[in-house]
């Protein structure tokens, strides 16, 4: 097999995941790969010259983000153009806090009046404030639990995947993933969530129970705007309604209806939402399993633990039916033959040669890219471009010599 990633470059993929053991150069590889794709135009008959820049979005799913360090540029939870490649490459770092601080969780920390609460009596306002404070405390507990919940990193990343699953703006999404364990949980989420939804929705009476619970919440929070009333034909009178008798007829009713409508959920809405999520997850799963749309690039170094974990990762990817036929072996000690021997280099080369032989035997039907150990850090677009060159062209120490990725001072 060709020892480069040129096949990926011309495969018209939509998603590429880059993963492996921690500390093997996943971020450098994913950033270089994103730079390579962003600088390779794609065919477009509607564009001048028949080509246009490929629009690439690089997403870091690792809780310990490094994209900002690799590009010497600060990124956040939203796509930000990469300096020097503004037309073709954007990057973002998924933050689980954004997921736990979303609209749903924020609403639980206390609903605010829209101004109509001024028509309430002092007693009603006090009662409404008491109900709101109670739910605010519950919401605070739920938010804290969500922030510390095991798996929240994977769920927040999956939420971003769902967000971009139907977008047509980007031609390619590249995921700089977390170490192997996190990544495997992320890739298993579509199957896990689909199975969970099926089991939950098969429970008789679950949707009516959710509907009843939402009505209870709506009844209490409805006190902010007045009596809850029968806005949806099923909500009962709020317990705080007797204290509103002093208000003029109809005052606060519009606010009450608006307040409760935010919280009352019907059984049909529950089923419809569950079905929508189920269909979206099936679409994500279909993309994961389509080798023409999704590919996984494994990154490792020529050492026992890394090679062992790479084999485990490849086996798990096969289990989930996710295409993977590319492996990047980083940090190889490769010296020109004219260089005098070095005791330390020779020792490292001996160890690496042992594991490179195993890699060649295990993955003879893979594209195995062998990348050299560099004397400088790979930081910034110019350095990443130099590094990316050898993802599509085999590196030879005798031909290319040492690679200086940083500009001389």
Curated annotation (Swiss-Prot):
GO MF, one annotated term: metal ion binding
Subcellular localization(s) per the UniProt record: Cytoplasm; Endoplasmic reticulum
Main location: cytoplasm
Residues bound to ATP: 21-28, 303, 330
Positions with a binding annotation for Zn(2+): 342, 345
Enzyme Commission identifier(s): 3.6.-.-
Function: ATPase required for the post-translational delivery of tail-anchored (TA) proteins to the endoplasmic reticulum. Recognizes and selectively binds the transmembrane domain of TA proteins in the cytosol. This complex then targets to the endoplasmic reticulum by membrane-bound receptors, where the tail-anchored protein is released for insertion. This process is regulated by ATP binding and hydrolysis. ATP binding drives the homodimer towards the closed dimer state, facilitating recognition of newly synthesized TA membrane proteins. ATP hydrolysis is required for insertion.
NCBIfam families per record: GET3_arsA_TRC40 (TIGR00345)
Protein name: ATPase ASNA1 homolog
